A protein has these predicted regions:
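Intrinsically disordered, low-complexity coil segments
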Residues: 49-68, 101-103, 118-124, 165-166, ...
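Conserved SGNH/GDSL esterase-like catalytic core that processes O-acyl groups on lipids
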Residues: 10-106
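Short, surface-exposed connector motifs at secondary-structure boundaries
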Residues: 1-2, 124
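Conserved catalytic region of serine esterases and O-acyltransferases that act on ester linkages
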Residues: 194-195, 199-277
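Catalytic nucleophile serine of serine hydrolases
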Residues: 7
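Short hydrophobic segments within beta-strands
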Residues: 2-4, 33, 130
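Alpha-helical cap/lid subdomain in secreted, periplasmic
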Residues: 72-205, 217
Length: 277
């Protein structure tokens, strides 16, 4: 699996190696083509440019991501470095491209899909789109750009619907919906964080865990038949720093995060009330 994206892609995939290992899956190779803050039009425009991406990798059976230097690869070289079964794209959640449809975004997604297909003309990979997430309820973008968090989530959903209707994206990974679901649960404490770091990125612990469970259910389960339910991977780091907030993943809260992911996969364009969890 190749994940093309930015820091939000790290949020969605950071806990995947541990989850795969816990599930007994030791034959999946994963790579992240990463550039912090990059938007899909920039990935498209600079596809063959040198020193654009950091190459993160997780070899089959490994339990963490590794990298071989910083911003020292072209996206083209990474796409052409292996034969991929799945490639995902992710827009920068901090950019209007994540929620406002225009020809630039449509052209970038379609163009990247073309490049991916050209690299594997006889064996086109499944191409997925990792959904953006709504900012924490206390973010300064409200009400500047959106009246509230629900309005932002609805704009993101509308954007994803247009992407699937007007580009060659095959599947959506609804990590943004899993976060919204989790926010309705008892895990969303009244601490001003709204399961985020600085109202922007995902909580290092439980929110990233729910996002990884969403990726697992959407991409890994159909290929392996292995369910994410009951996954034994845990994450013990705890922090109350605003920019590094981390809710540890425990035996008590992991099933709630996984439920948020499963419900997101079941109804990706609507929030599921999880107040009973």
């Amino acid at each position: 699996i190749l994940f093309i994206g930015n820091s939000f892609t790290v949020d969605a995939t950071e806990h995947l190696p541990g989850m795969l290992k816990s599930a007994g899956i030791t034959h999946v190779r994963m790579v992240r083509a990463y550039h912090g803050g990059y938007k899909l039009p920039e990935f498209f425009e600079n596809y063959a440019a040198p020193d654009i991406c950091t190459y993160y990798y997780c070899e089959p059976g490994a339990t963490k991501w590794e990298n071989e230097g910083t911003l020292n690869r072209s996206l083209k070289s990474i796409v052409e470095s292996d034969t991929w079964d799945i490639v995902t794209l992710q827009e920068h959640t901090g950019s209007y491209y994540a929620w406002e449809w225009d020809e630039t975004e449509r052209g970038a997604i379609s163009g990247l899909c073309d490049y991916i297909q050209q690299a594997q003309p006889l064996d086109r990979p499944t191409i997925g789109y990792i959904m953006a997430q709504a900012y924490g309820a206390y973010h300064s973008h409200y009400p500047k750009y959106f009246a509230n968090q629900q309005a932002m989530f609805e704009a993101i959903v509308a954007q994803v619907r247009k992407i699937t209707a007007q580009t060659c994206i095959d599947i959506v990974i609804p990590s943004g919906t899993s976060l919204q679901n989790l926010r309705t649960s008892s895990l969303n404490r009244d601490n001003g964080m709204d399961l985020t770091r600085a109202s922007y990125h995902m909580d290092y612990g439980i929110s990233r865990y729910a996002a990884a469970a969403t990726v697992f259910r959407t991409l890994v389960t159909p290929c392996t038949g292995v369910s994410v339910e009951g996954n034994g991977y845990r994450y013990s780091t705890s922090s109350t720093s605003t920019t590094g907030y981390s809710t540890p993943v425990t035996d008590a809260n992991a099933p709630v995060a996984i439920r948020a992911a499963l419900e997101a996969c079941r109804t990706p364009y609507a929030v599921t009330d999880m107040s009973k969890y």
